[in-house]
């Protein structure tokens, strides 16, 4: 005997159906409904399904666009981080040339050596950039204004890029939630259509 619970399951609500396959199925489904709508028996179904289709794939496109922008912002931020790492490494010679390696001034810049900067990550890079800028500002008279201004510009650029990246990540997350909700709508619409068509052609 057939398990009647299968009738109440939404067979479109599965990760095994990709977005592309969902799109193709919905398009073919709409084409066939339209081709067989000579007596307008499928008009309401076509209208509802078209609305669900448009809403869903509009959301997908929006999510893709925002994700692409987020990825671009991430590249920008990573480039700034890499530029700072190179900057801190290159300026070590100038700091060492003006202060001995055991001096308090040198330790302000490189308390754990140059490798600390080379091994920096997103968890500590802003702290290191802030520290380097503060030290360059304190010793500007000896090391020159350019080191201080370059360190400040890198710190400012990083903060702007990081803020923009995090904001876009938040937008992408919110858009994913919207897309998921919209996919539920078209999944339900397609399953409802299956039941309606079945009820129209019993036997």
PLM features: what roles do these ranges have?
Residues 1-203:
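Basic/polar low-complexity intrinsically disordered segments
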């Amino acid at each position: 005997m057939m398990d009647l619970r299968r009738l109440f399951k939404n067979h479109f609500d599965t990760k095994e159906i990709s977005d592309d396959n969902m799109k193709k199925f919905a398009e073919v489904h709409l084409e066939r409904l339209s081709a067989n709508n000579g007596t307008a028996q499928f008009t309401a179904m076509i209208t509802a399904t078209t609305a669900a289709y448009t809403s869903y794939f509009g959301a997908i496109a929006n999510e893709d666009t925002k994700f692409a922008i987020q990825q671009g912002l991430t590249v920008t931020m990573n480039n700034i981080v890499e530029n700072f790492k190179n900057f801190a490494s290159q300026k070590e010679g100038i700091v060492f040339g003006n202060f001995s390696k055991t001096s308090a001034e040198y330790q302000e810049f490189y308390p754990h050596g140059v490798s600390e900067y080379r091994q920096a990550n997103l968890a500590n890079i802003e702290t290191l950039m802030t520290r380097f800028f503060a030290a360059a500002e304190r010793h500007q008279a000896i090391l020159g204004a350019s080191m201080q201004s370059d360190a400040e510009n890198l710190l400012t650029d990083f903060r702007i890029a990081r803020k923009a990246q995090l904001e876009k990540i938040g937008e992408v997350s919110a858009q994913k939630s919207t897309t998921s909700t919209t996919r539920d709508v078209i999944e339900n619409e397609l399953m409802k259509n299956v039941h309606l068509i079945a009820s129209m052609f019993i036997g």
